[in-house]
Amino acid sequence: MTNIRKTHPLTKIINNSFIDLPAPSNISAWWNFGSLLGICLIIQILTGLFLAMHYTSDTATAFSSVTHICRDVNYGWIIRYMHANGASMFFICLFLHVGRGLYYGSYMFTETWNIGITLLFAVMATAFMGYVLPWGQMSFWGATVITNLLSAIPYIGTNLVEWIWGGFSVDKATLTRFFAFHFILPFIISALAAVHLLFLHETGSNNPSGIPSDSDKIPFHPYYTIKDILGALLLILMLTLLVLFSPDLLGDPDNYIPANPLNTPPHIKPEWYFLFAYAILRSIPNKLGGVLALIFSILILAIIPLLHTSKQRSMMFRPLSQCLFWLLVADLLTLTWIGGQPVEHPFIIIGQLASILYFMILLVLMPIISIIENNMLKW
């Protein structure tokens, strides 16, 4: 009798994706982040669902409803902080996942890579709108500043901003629609993640060497299921430690002050995971130029496959490219630091230099160094 796992239409999909899937024998812990992102998404959807049961998307009661969740709802505080810090864990995993893709040349699977970029944009949009919902000072002013950037679009900009706001400022209509979008987007992300996996399974996974591994595959279960469970346990441990010991470590104290349109906070800044893009935005004195640089700082990932000039796929055997990659990581950390600093000397010039370096590495230095490495190897 044939195993039902391999014949039933539903279990067959699960079997071919998570059990009998042929996987490279040498993929390292850097390949764990896909499953960790799936776990993060599930945590966010579940905690978000329970928060939505008690939250009210009205300017008069939004802040109070969040306070009510933390004070009066059974274990409401843990649900709220799991959700807030879960977003941080989500972005840590995202950045490491994208970094792995850049380092090992996984971007050569262009369909998978492009859906990944779409997912990144969707998660960033979701996180931004979620940050607005508690209706604290940073929620209100963050929403005002970021949505206002659209007014830089020639001709239609002002109308577009007022259309998104649902009025002439960030108000009740804005909060209500942001809540609606924040609720629906994770389900769209889930569907996109399924398509991401679909395209990945068309080609099979890449591996650290960047060499095709068709001749040496092992079943996903039990080898990588065990490995993923270990990663999941470490992720949950880190999240639990963060939630129980320092839940406000990554948040902004200003968000404990109810939103007040008449009082601007001294330093308006987004959550830590947007600071690198915010620094790039601020480093350009022109509004439209800043917005374009902001968008392109993420969209640049889409042209990475076109800029791949190396004869090797992975950076595993390319020390010069490795040096450039880690310079890029250091540059992004510098941008993250600058994004959280006030707009004054010397932070302005450091931010501008770091922004130039970011685009220089990806657009100019990486392709040139790859060609030099090809010549050094006489390829």
UniProtKB/Swiss-Prot annotation:
An annotated GO cellular component: respiratory chain complex III
SUPFAM superfamilies, per the entry: a domain/subunit of cytochrome bc1 complex (Ubiquinol-cytochrome c reductase), Transmembrane di-heme cytochromes
Any one GO BP annotation for this protein: mitochondrial electron transport, ubiquinol to cytochrome c
Annotated localization: Mitochondrion inner membrane
Chain sites annotated for binding a ubiquinone: 201
The keyword Acyltransferase is annotated on this UniProt entry: no
Similarity comment text for this entry: Belongs to the cytochrome b family.
Function as written in the Swiss-Prot or TrEMBL entry: Component of the ubiquinol-cytochrome c reductase complex (complex III or cytochrome b-c1 complex) that is part of the mitochondrial respiratory chain. The b-c1 complex mediates electron transfer from ubiquinol to cytochrome c. Contributes to the generation of a proton gradient across the mitochondrial membrane that is then used for ATP synthesis.
Protein name: Cytochrome b
Native organism: Mustela putorius furo (European domestic ferret)
Species classification: Eukaryota, Metazoa, Chordata, Craniata, Vertebrata
